[in-house]
């Protein structure tokens, strides 16, 4: 048995997804710190979720993270906004880094796209690890900066990083 594996997300887990999204560990570093209401989640799920590709990252067949990738276009460019949702109230650094590697393996298979991540400035662990996964800071002078920040509604307390795939 593989120690780590992936499993595609489907509509059957709509309530589990909301439960994981509302865990304190996820809200702590999210732009939205409030718990998401079921009705808002259902509305988002059946409208916006179609633009998102998500899969569970499993450890010994138990979900530890959800990898998310929102795909969208800006002019002639294809973008991916990537994120991780913890399925556990607490995570360890090894599992987090392994999940990021699995997520990056998926992202690196996408071609001719720009991938963006945003990291809460208070998240000391991730603020020190983005460079090891091929990301660079998205500077304010970059042509994409204003569009990405506004389109994705990224708050002032977040840094944006990107890589060209």
Residue ranges of each PLM-predicted region?
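A short helix-loop-beta-strand connector motif used in the catalytic cores of GNAT acetyltransferases and
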Residues: 43-56, 65
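Conserved N-terminal entry element of GNAT/NAT acetyltransferase domains
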Residues: 1-12, 153-165
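Conserved GNAT-fold acetyl-CoA-binding loop/helix
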Residues: 25-43
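Conserved beta-strand in the GNAT
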Residues: 62-72, 81
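Conserved acetyl-CoA binding element of GNAT-fold acetyltransferases
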Residues: 76-89, 118
